[in-house]
Amino acid sequence: MHMFEIHREEIEWAGRKLVLETGKIARQADGAIFATYGETTVLATVVSAKSVKPGVDFFPLTVNYQEKAFAAGRIPGGYFKREGRPSERETLVSRLIDRPIRPLFPEGYRNETQVIVTVLAHDLENDPDILSMVASSAALTLSGVPFMGPVGAARVAYVNGQYKINPTLDEVKDTALDLVVAGTSDAVLMVESEAKELSEDVMLGAVMAGHSSFQPVIDAIIRLAEKAAKEPRDLILPDKTEVEVAVLAIAENDLREAYKITSKQDRYAAVDAVKAKVFGDLLPAEGEAKFPKDLVAEVFHDLQAKVVRWNILDNGIRIDGRDVKTVRPILAEVGILPRAHGSALFTRGETQALVVATLGTGEDEQLIDNLEGTYRERFLLHYNFPPYSVGEAGRMGSPGRREIGHGKLAWRAIHPMLPTPAEFPYTIRVVSEITESNGSSSMATVCGSSLALMDAGVPLKRPTAGIAMGLILEGERYAVLSDILGDEDHLGDMDFKVAGTEEGITSLQMDIKITGINEEIMRVALGQAKEGRLHILGEMAKAITGARAELGEFAPRIETLRIPTEKIREVIGTGGKVIREICEKTGAKINIEDDGTVKVASSDGNSIKAAINWIKSIATDPEVGHIYDGTVVKVVDFGAFVNFFGSKDGLVHISQLAKGRVAKTSDVVKEGDKVKVKLLGFDDRGKVRLSMRLVDQETGEDLEGKEPPQAEAGE
């Protein structure tokens, strides 16, 4: 007897085997796929409620991507030794899975739906994120849930002028492009990328190369669905025709007038008044409602979108009165906070970001622990979106998925422009506080971050700016919108964010909600985005054009020196005793790397100098003939022991204390005296021989050869 009815599809994809299997694991889920690529394995499951919860007027879709430590043969750290709250990476991959599948559910589908993807094995070569996107799409396609997929996904790298599909984790480290693209058989739905100043044509080529590369994956999912898919659920959507006619009659003219108001708050008030009028007429407080409330609300929202779209396509005029290419007025300011290492205020229309850069040392690096292992991150960018930025009162707390996603988008835009650790050995943290928002706060963060970093003296390769674009498509007509408002973001068919320098693109993010947007439209859109980006860079240059020559007054200074690797142990000392003493006595922070690189940091230059001299005294040997400052540590009958060069002790014989005959050591020096000594050499037991007589104790001048030789006693 066979317990399982297993169906599988296997294809060769970008040089590795992709296996999609269903029927053995998680059989009570609506859809479940056990997927393997190389030796990376994920389980994707889909469950969608059979009915809609009362009062739900949106599509409650949640995507949870989770990495299990056992997948890489590891035990989680921390006290509890088990997986805890989602990491930043898990949150970002959850968003990556969510974005291309969300637009493919029918409008009006309100059943709570949950996609859970669990990484079960990781071969440390094939990133599980692409496999998770493919497996989620396959699970949805098999589930019977109304889903207009399947979706494919691929990662594209750009190496030596060639596109490489699904590079390994090692290959991604050295590429000029790391781009993820997802879509259906005939449309691109999502792009997420980081690039090293690539042209619009190279970026678009990567998108199209990725799209064509995952077509065999979509075909495999369709073949699997033909064998194993569940019966499609009946989806009965209400007929909106009557409601649309009624709402249009009441609201069209008033909505058109409301959307001519350029101020966001006033416009919202006018739209709310129109909505209240519609609800008052169609859903009277007394008597019977003419239509269901949620249906009226949905149709009213649709009409809002149509009014804005009609106005743009018919007249070329947008909500705030701009034409399609105009960027809102920009004001860039730097150095606005007195004690910050670097700060900027970037205002574009009704969107504003206060961005602050802080410099730290190696010990401030973030330790990141994921399936690939543990690594240290020296560039941190945190994006905060407080509710007051949109004139609302709301929850404050730890960052949500959106804030993490927007922060990472800005991080990708700035990261390729950072100096190397050798050029600039600082840990860098940028915090963006969105103080006003009406569209494209993530791109305001990119601009503000670039300004704040330059204000802090970080030598960026070039200033970076970002712009959010929108697109409206009706049949053959389309309009590309530069610098979109918040309202235009969710009323359009495509929104995409492009960040980069005057030389090229560093980050591209696209979300496309409909089919029919082809390569040519994307090319026009990217060209218009470049115009906007260059305009914004010009406005930013009015505030600052490059990194300041000096670091901020309150930023730590870091100086670097190299010591022999065999001396590292001596500088650190038993249990860290020596390095701890240096830090405590000098006030400097010290970081020693395995190759002997030592970074000494402090906001006080004298503190750095003292620490470096101390380290040098331990790590380098004193040279014969050199003159050193020293301290008398012990007085004996035959001379004085002097501590010099930090931690070295040597003997000044009584005959080398001063000119002429010295009867008693204590006649010349006593313990604690500061003296100048010349290193004469070493005796046959390796002990250090010093002279005070050959050094002018006032000036430190070398007196050797300027006086007759004098024999040491006992010679």
Curated annotation (Swiss-Prot):
Which enzyme class? transferase
Entry EC number(s): 2.7.7.8
Q: Which GO terms describe its biological process?
A: mRNA catabolic process; RNA processing
The record, for InterPro entries, names: ExoRNase_PH_dom1, ExoRNase_PH_dom2, ExoRNase_PH_dom2_sf, KH_dom, KH_dom_type_1, KH_dom_type_1_sf, NA-bd_OB-fold, PNPase
Q: Which residues bind Mg(2+)?
A: 489, 495
> Cellular component per GO?
cytosol
Q: Name one Pfam family in it.
A: KH_1
Q: Where in the cell is it found?
A: Cytoplasm
What job does the chain carry out? Answer: Involved in mRNA degradation. Catalyzes the phosphorolysis of single-stranded polyribonucleotides processively in the 3'- to 5'-direction.
The molecule here is called Polyribonucleotide nucleotidyltransferase
Q: Could you tell me the gene encoding this protein?
A: pnp
